[in-house]
């Protein structure tokens, strides 16, 4: 089977990762020890994508948990799902990266990276046909961003033919832990543009807004934010974990969503999102799900899709839904809002339906959009980066770890290039595309036509 190896790096990555494993164990009928207690054959049919069956009959996640300090990993070990994971797959240092990207990427992280790669190799050897890796991390800290991107590039070297998907939490000014987040994020994006195949951008600010405005939680805790992320991750990976035709592995997902290799940063959305109080007062319908999942307020990245255009979209509906109704609704959305979809990629909205609903819900929908408006997110980080870098503020934290200012300049210009590429394709239209092709036809061919 086509296996996926999961890596959690840093505090944020491990917390999201733990929430993800808890969610999918519940969906696949596994208890906290990895024993199958479900009653639906569909739950077992593609279990080996994420789980390894041990001789004892228990299912063990193909997960490697990495951090430069022991705190978060200890919390995962002692949590209710702590017994799921293979004890050798917890790898942690004692020092911490202190929120500095350079420590995670060049010094502290580089010392730990070989022992992580040993575990990754061992996991890969236990696979029949490895399709790729998924990594959860944040871009604002030191370990998830610095060591996370180091791991991505090392795994890229060693497994060049496999896919690399990342769930990356982008820092936002409203929910900020440290002042140097823009540096860490820009240096990370510089790496992700080159080394990741698909990056799902999740943004703390957007998560807070959803919790406060839609779920009516006045003071959302990290656990509640992580639950949101884990429902999205569970939705995004539905087609990988259950039998189906569309986007059934990471590569097919990328083929449908990535028109140009550098533009692989996706926005994700999820429905139904309802506050606890009003849950019992509404029934969820397909039109309502479609409406809500395309709603800008429910995007998990703080950029507004109405300010850009969708290059491609993938939607996953789960539960007892009629395929025809789903297709009709999606078609309606496209025809009513045709100006928000680029016209030079035909059939750029793909829809998949899976009959197994998430736990405790009748139906749900997950949305992945490759929208040019994601540039807002990079612009925001870029502006903060430039403001500090112009004055060389806090640079000594990085140069003292052996980094060069040149790297900062390169990262900045790579991110600016990314923004202008998105802008270029936002403005492109069919006529321009045809003109470009016309330029490429040699004159004698043109004359023959």
From Swiss-Prot:
Keyword terms: Cytoplasm, Cytoskeleton, GTP-binding, Magnesium, Metal-binding, Microtubule, Nucleotide-binding
Endpoints of the signal sequence: none
GO process terms (BP): cytoplasmic microtubule organization; mitotic spindle assembly; mitotic spindle elongation; positive regulation of intracellular protein transport
Coiled-coil boundaries: none
Name of protein: Tubulin beta chain
Name of the gene encoding the protein in the UniProt record: TUB2
Role summary: Tubulin is the major constituent of microtubules, a cylinder consisting of laterally associated linear protofilaments composed of alpha- and beta-tubulin heterodimers. Microtubules grow by the addition of GTP-tubulin dimers to the microtubule end, where a stabilizing cap forms. Below the cap, tubulin dimers are in GDP-bound state, owing to GTPase activity of alpha-tubulin.
GO MF: GTP binding; GTPase activity; metal ion binding; structural constituent of cytoskeleton
Necessary cofactors: Mg(2+)
Classification lineage: Eukaryota, Fungi, Dikarya, Ascomycota, Saccharomycotina
Binding sites annotated in the UniProt record for GTP: 11, 69, 138, 142-144, 204, 226
SUPFAM superfamilies xrefs: Tubulin C-terminal domain-like, Tubulin nucleotide-binding domain-like
Residues that coordinate or bind Mg(2+): 69
Organism field: Candida albicans
CDD domains recorded: beta_tubulin
Pfam families, per database record: Tubulin, Tubulin_C
